[in-house]
Amino acid sequence: MSSTRMPALFLGHGSPMNVLEDNLYTRSWQKLGMTLPRPQAIVVVSAHWFTRGTGVTAMETPPTIHDFGGFPQALYDTHYPAPGSPALAQRLVKLLAPVPVTLDKEDWGFDHGSWGVLIKMYPDADIPMVQLSIDSSKPAAWHFEMGRKLAALRDEGIMLVASGNVVHNLRTVKWHGDSSPYPWAMSFNEYVKANLTWQGPVEQHPLVNYLDHEGGALSNPTPEHYLPLLYVLGAWDGQEPITIPVDGIEMGSLSMLSVQIG
């Protein structure tokens, strides 16, 4: 057991271009890497590994996945060679039981939702990492409960990093001109922040029932970028501080909100 409890982070990752850029959000990720206790290992949950069933990367050297198209060549030339941890993958299999977890040794790696933020936090890529997939067949409350199980790792020197965007509607993105947030995007983003510290039965949690908000479905036409937040909220002990390292809405409907537990 580690003497220092590791924080749990939800990071709004946004565009892959953040890898190449220096902006408010990337600087906040850099600051987290410089100021938080250094983890022995990282478990990352990314919106970009959305599967039927649960998988975890279990290879020694996971590949860098460039899961995007139409970006500058410099982005495809960027790699994040962080080591994997088959031992940590096996630990997750036991910790998450009876949920069946598949050990992935060849199909996935670190996608841009994970390495795109961690390359700013830990640019030396020298911390062992595994990536856990998001089961597309499960309801929101189930993902919150997965976070509760993962919380135990925080006392073992392992940091939980979840990566997504709480408002993620690419169909309404303002690619050019006025990039001011849509009112519904602002409303939902504020709703998320207002309910981060809510306590009560999981099934009644406002952020588990996020689609009940009038802007919930428009902010998240699909759930994969929202669900990573629930893993982090599930890992909260109900007493630790919850802070917001950075916030903002880009291109009208892309929230860059980040949340820190502990």
Regions found by a protein language model. Name each.
Residues 75-83, 105, 133-140, 216:
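Flexible, glycine/proline-enriched loop segments at strand-loop-helix junctions
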Residues 47-51, 62, 109-118, 166:
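Short glycine-enriched loops at secondary-structure junctions
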Residues 2-3, 35-36, 121-125, 152:
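Solvent-exposed alpha-helices and their adjacent loops that cap or buttress functional pockets
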Residues 89-144, 149:
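Internal, conserved structured core segments that host functional sites
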Residues 9-10, 67-72, 122-130, 207-208:
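Short, basic/glycine-rich phosphate-binding loops at helix/coil junctions
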Residues 7-11, 41-46, 132, 153-166, ...:
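Beta-strand elements within well-structured catalytic alpha/beta cores of enzymes
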